[in-house]
């Protein structure tokens, strides 16, 4: 699997809450979002360049509580296509995720605790080209992941600054599979753990008029990738008596991530999202991504959006 698929199992992006009436606190608000993302990963000494394309759809429901807490449940289906190198190798994956999330005020409605926990399933078609020989296979996987994020909102007029600290934990179990083709190999089950510590500062500026609400936002983040290795056990189908065990090291300990974007919500409750993201793995390379999304909030009085991306 590519580094990009394992880099972030769940990320909660930009929470804003403003229920207009206390009587609406117990309502359930439904929403839907379709998204596209595409990007590139630079070639390094140990890995080939990659082109990434992802499209998906998410549906969810949010509930306000009497304590101004928000709880939600979302289901996401996405297709992830990764082209590796120039010889035709690729990884195509269908991903299904079910995610529970909440945001809870912990101090004067200025400090919040966000929590995310979810499960996922992966179904992958793998095609590798080595020395002109094409090898193919199918592999499945299961995921569990969670995030805790403590943030504070510092507001001045239409500008909000949001310093935050976050920890991500994830576990992925990949099934065994066998390739077909010349020099094919058989791979054993593989477990992958992820642990990330993040420190960030984000800014959100609100610009409204009679036709739409617009938010310009940006973020810079330091991410410590605390677990970057996994063991791959395999053998050649033509000689199953010899077993190989290779440690796969991916990513960098220190990472700097930045993003800028615009969110536009129209009076008819359709919304448009655009985000440009640059992730620099210090000493290893960088990844660029562009995210485009269209969302829909059915209720006219819904002022809450919680966007989730799980890869």
Regions found by a protein language model. Name each.
Residues 1-28, 298-307:
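Outer-membrane beta-barrel biogenesis signature
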